[in-house]
Amino acid sequence: MASTVIYLDESGDLGWKFDAPYRKGGSSRYLTISALCVPTEKKHLPKRVIKRLYDKFNKATNDELKWAAMNSDERKYFAEQAHKLCLNHSDISFRAIVVKKENVLAHIRSDGNKLYNYMIKLLLIDFMAQFDVVTLIPDPRSIKVQSGNSLHDYLQTELWFTNKANTNLITTPMDSKECLGLQFSDMLAGIVQSRHEDNFAGIFQLLQGKISVKPLFF
């Protein structure tokens, strides 16, 4: 029975204040959701990358390493190791979707959770439909899992009724402090967000060809 694990995180915010620069009173202009997709039997491999990152830079594992707080050497090392992971394991994939928030219509802005859900569907539904069992692990502090209908129910309904897939979806929110797979996904989101928000392509180029990025409302 084919199964996969998907670790889901995001970068950016769901604010809509665009009359001031980002980080100076204004909201981010982009929102990125990233997914680390790994076969169930290989879910230990991305975790090893994060453990090596902690070891190389003498970081305490009880102090979560977040992309926003990493220096350039740490970021470069992660990107190089992530690239190597994909080279050695073609069934491990990195995916992301980026929304240009200034182009989001006003009535959609009123319910950010629905925007999250829609972005995640666009990003993952066709991939999920290839598997018998999908374990989805979002960070509840960032990915909003409730919006009237939960993200889980929304995706399961889409899989069964729209994609005609018999995929069984298991959604297990976890705190990223306790999950190295989510920390990996946080770093993926940071790489993609930096490419768009700050027009910084340096680290992103280290993963080009190994990360699939969907644009929304560009």
Residue ranges and their predicted role:
Residues 1-218:
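Phosphate-ester processing/binding pockets and catalytic centers
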